[in-house]
């Protein structure tokens, strides 16, 4: 992440990507997986206060680098993933409370220190006031959702090009415009059911390390969906993250696939362990 901050390319105002041989990739997407394995490895046996503090310092460094790179969505995903993995490892509500308070304080500090954070908050608070500049994205997104209504305008009958970066940040708005809000709600239900299945698998795992990994993947997955859809519907400020498996972006799709492969591999391992115990 530090290398990207120094040498990376600026994409849509954020320094988050590299280009090698004409192929652009976003390292922060792949670092998510390494980050989760680091958290699980650090906390699966030792959950002492000293270990949690050391883990928090390292996790905090990741978040700070992402904020400075203007990759606010990834910073939030890393932070929330850390807080909930720590809670899953310790079962201590004080850590959860401290994470929420710390996150709120950090958000306020980021608002005071970084112009790009203030711009996104202002655009979220009153996009109609800034419809010609910083509020243009969110207003066009809301127009698209409203135009689609319940049943949509029909496939290929919408106007997705009116929304900047529709293929990434605002793909949900385009789906609602062409296929309708009902279809969008069904899509949300599919994502939520996938999350619940991840948590169900995590609860059944006896190996603490694998359990924390699956918990972390589930939290990051559902929180990223919340950020994308919430930003596009003006429920929260825009964060610039993709909708897993749906938005355009090879790094995002590949990372999500790897995360699902990891869970599937752990689930197969769990089934085999159950068969061995049943045989005995």
PLM regions: where:
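A juxtamembrane structural motif centered on a specific transmembrane helix
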Residues: 228-280
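Juxtamembrane loop-helix boundary motifs flanking transmembrane segments in multi-pass membrane proteins
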Residues: 56, 133, 137, 163-171, ...
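Arg/Lys-rich, often Gly-containing low-complexity segments of ribosomal proteins
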Residues: 13, 147, 239
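Short capping/connector residues at structural and topological boundaries
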Residues: 23-25, 30, 77, 156, ...
């Amino acid at each position: 992440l530090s290398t990207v901050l120094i040498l990376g390319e600026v994409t849509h105002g954020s320094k988050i990507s590299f280009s090698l041989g004409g192929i652009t990739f976003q390292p922060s997407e792949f670092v998510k997986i390494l980050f989760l394995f680091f958290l699980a490895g650090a906390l699966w046996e030792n959950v002492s206060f000293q270990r949690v503090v050391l883990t928090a310092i390292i996790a905090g460094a990741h978040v700070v680098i992402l904020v400075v790179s203007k990759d606010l969505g990834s910073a939030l995903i890393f932070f929330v993933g850390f807080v909930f993995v720590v809670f899953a490892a310790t079962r201590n509500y004080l850590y959860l409370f401290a994470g929420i308070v710390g996150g709120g304080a950090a958000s306020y500090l980021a608002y005071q220190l970084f112009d790009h954070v203030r711009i996104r908050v202002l655009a979220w608070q009153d996009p109609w006031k800034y419809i010609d500049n910083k509020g243009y994205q969110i207003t066009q997104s809301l127009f698209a959702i409203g135009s689609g209504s319940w049943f949509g305008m029909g496939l290929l009958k919408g106007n997705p090009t009116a929304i900047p970066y529709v293929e990434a940040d605002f793909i949900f708005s385009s789906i609602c415009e062409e296929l309708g809000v009902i279809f969008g709600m069904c899509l949300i239900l599919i994502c939520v059911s996938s999350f619940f299945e991840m948590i169900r698998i995590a609860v059944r795992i006896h190996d603490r390390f694998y359990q924390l990994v699956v918990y972390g993947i589930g939290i990051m997955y559902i929180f990223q969906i919340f950020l994308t859809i919430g930003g596009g519907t003006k429920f929260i400020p825009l964060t610039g993250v993709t909708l897993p498996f749906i938005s355009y972006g090879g790094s995002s799709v590949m990372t999500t696939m790897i995360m699902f492969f990891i869970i599937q591999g752990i689930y197969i391992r769990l089934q085999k362990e159950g068969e061995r115990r049943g045989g005995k």
